[in-house]
């Protein structure tokens, strides 16, 4: 552990993916632990922007991807050293190297054996990454019934070493330096002594098991697109990028962590349901500072979880009532010989109730055949006042043949000479102008993330991203909706790029990065090209689509104009995760 005056500093370690040195580890970023605080490690393993192992990842999963297996090798062989550095810290250095020698004699081999044995368990038992992490914690901090154990004996020897340093102050020091010296070693002793407790070591293991379990449940309980939204929003890589720079950080492997008050989090886990613990972990993954989690915040999260459960119960009850009502109506129709001319007051009330409930839960606007928008009677309360659509986006409304003809004679080289089949595939991904309904609304920020500005070809551009699912026939594709914009000479926002990019969990980090946006953007935008006012946009005749927006998603459904019961294509854009 490297200490500075006033308290201990723990070093974040990363494992080097490129140069496999003896340990494969580098210590990069430092942070300070306050009294009562502890580091928790999330069972997600990253390489640069991308995630290469989830809490649920098994060895059998890795065998299918040799690249990830190779990237994870340094982690597997150094797992116990990594956890040691997070939980305890690296060895303090002295002129005589006494603590370094003590660590090498007592802990080096011990930790190596743990890494090897846990790796065997992971491979042969086909365990998950979260189970591997739990096993590392259990074995490092294991204590026997008498209160002994390898860890406790090592701490005893370290404390004795600190006592010797405190008692034998160098005689050549003046009074001021002696005071600093004494404060330094006394603080170091106090920190190490805090681990000389069976209860504290048990807390370390219990806390990590709780976090691993919550992360595992999050991965198992969320659909892929929801999980992608979680990783797209998270505060991953910030400390690493600040220290190493964007390019260097993108090549490193690491685990994410949080600093929390262990007593408060453990008490919350015991007092509340597992759903509350899971939500707390989710909020930390989204970027909530663990040190800001106090009892008041936990109470707030518990109330949110309780309200969410009540809402689900109400929705379930409502669905059951509707199902029973439909069954009763069906039976009633069979029992009647003649259709009733009038409508009872009761049925009128039921109909009115259904309409009110539907309007409360979702807003619906549809574009009929030929693009005639159904009026809702509501005026816009603001949002994006000036919004135009560039010709690059509008061209995808046309037939594949006309699109190909236009692209072949256009300025963008990457589109020239593409086959008609390829253009048809790209039309599916680019012809999603129904997204404009959401982009122009007040709720756009609830769905789209602003990934920042970049400059290319002499113009400043901005990119908005949203997680979504595109369904075409039986194909279901997860990915991101990309919207590229720039400001014209009048200051109006112009949409020059719109597409659905098929993306998985593993690549979501890279796709969200500024480098990806710049590398995949067109070189030059014809900013003088005539643009269409988004408010006047309509699809060509023969196209029918509907947009539906509720609390959690925005949906666009394209239907067969000849048979509106047939859905040709659907795009669902996920709402960004709730931050409490």
Swiss-Prot record:
Q: Which family does it belong to?
A: Belongs to the UPF0329 family.
Q: Where is this region: Disordered?
A: 308-384
What this protein is called in its record is UPF0329 protein ECU06_0080
Pfam families per record:
DUF1609, DUF3654
InterPro entries in the record, alphabetically? DUF3654, UPF0329
Q: Bias category Acidic residues: which stretches?
A: 351-363
Compositional bias, Basic and acidic residues, is annotated for: 308-330
Could you tell me where the Basic residues compositional bias lies?
Answer: 331-340, 372-384
């Amino acid at each position: 552990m490297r200490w500075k005056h006033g308290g201990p500093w723990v070093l974040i370690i990363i494992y080097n993916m490129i140069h496999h040195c003896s340990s494969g580890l580098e210590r990069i970023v430092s942070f300070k632990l306050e009294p009562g605080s502890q580091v928790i490690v999330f069972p997600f393993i990253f390489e640069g922007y991308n995630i290469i192992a989830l809490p649920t990842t098994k060895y059998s999963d890795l065998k299918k991807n040799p690249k990830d297996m190779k990237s994870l090798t340094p982690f597997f062989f150094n797992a116990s050293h990594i956890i040691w550095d997070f939980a305890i810290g690296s060895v303090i250095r002295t002129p005589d190297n006494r603590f370094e020698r003590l660590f090498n004699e007592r802990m080096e081999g011990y930790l190596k054996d743990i890494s090897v044995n846990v790796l065997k368990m992971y491979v042969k038992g086909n365990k998950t990454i979260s189970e591997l992490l739990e096993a590392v914690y259990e074995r490092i901090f294991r204590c026997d019934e008498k209160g002994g154990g390898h860890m406790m004996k090592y701490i005893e020897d370290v404390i004795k070493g600190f006592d010797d340093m405190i008692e034998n102050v160098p005689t050549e020091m003046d009074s001021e330096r002696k005071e600093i010296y004494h404060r330094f070693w006394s603080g170091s002793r106090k920190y190490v002594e805090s681990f000389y407790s069976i209860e504290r070591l048990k807390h370390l293991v219990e806390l990590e098991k709780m976090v691993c379990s919550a992360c595992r449940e999050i991965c198992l309980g969320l659909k892929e697109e929801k999980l992608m939204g979680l990783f797209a929003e998270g505060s991953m890589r910030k400390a690493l990028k600040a220290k190493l720079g964007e390019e260097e950080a993108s090549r490193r492997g690491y685990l994410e962590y949080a600093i929390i008050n262990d007593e408060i989090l453990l008490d919350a886990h015991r007092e509340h349901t597992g759903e509350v613990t899971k939500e707390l972990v989710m909020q930390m993954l989204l970027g909530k500072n663990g040190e800001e989690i106090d009892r008041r915040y936990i109470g707030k999260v518990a109330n949110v979880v309780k309200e969410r459960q009540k809402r689900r119960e109400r929705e379930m009850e409502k669905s059951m009532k509707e199902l029973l009502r439909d069954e009763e109506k069906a039976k009633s129709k069979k029992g009647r010989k003649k259709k009733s001319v009038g409508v009872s007051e009761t049925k009128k009330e039921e109909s009115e109730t259904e309409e009110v409930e539907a309007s409360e839960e979702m807003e619906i606007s549809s574009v009929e055949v030929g693009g005639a928008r159904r009026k809702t009677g509501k005026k816009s309360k603001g949002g994006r006042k000036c919004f135009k659509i560039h010709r690059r986006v509008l061209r995808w409304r046309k037939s594949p043949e006309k699109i190909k003809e236009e692209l072949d004679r256009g300025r963008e080289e990457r589109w020239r000479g593409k086959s008609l089949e390829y253009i048809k595939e790209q039309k599916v991904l680019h012809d999603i102008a129904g997204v404009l309904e959401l982009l122009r609304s007040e709720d756009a920020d609830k769905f789209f993330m602003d990934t920042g500005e970049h400059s290319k070809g002499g113009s400043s551009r901005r990119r908005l991203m949203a997680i979504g699912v595109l369904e075409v026939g039986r194909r279901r594709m997860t990915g991101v909706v990309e919207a590229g914009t720039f400001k014209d000479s009048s200051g109006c926002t112009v949409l020059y790029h719109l597409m659905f990019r098929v993306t998985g969990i593993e690549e979501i980090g890279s796709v969200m990065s500024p480098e990806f946006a710049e590398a995949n953007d067109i070189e030059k935008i014809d900013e003088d090209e005539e643009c269409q006012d988004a408010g006047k946009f309509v699809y060509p005749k023969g196209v029918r689509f509907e947009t539906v927006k509720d609390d959690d998603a925005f949906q666009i459904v394209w239907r067969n104009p000849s048979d509106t019961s047939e859905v040709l294509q659907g795009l669902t854009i996920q709402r960004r995760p709730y931050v409490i």
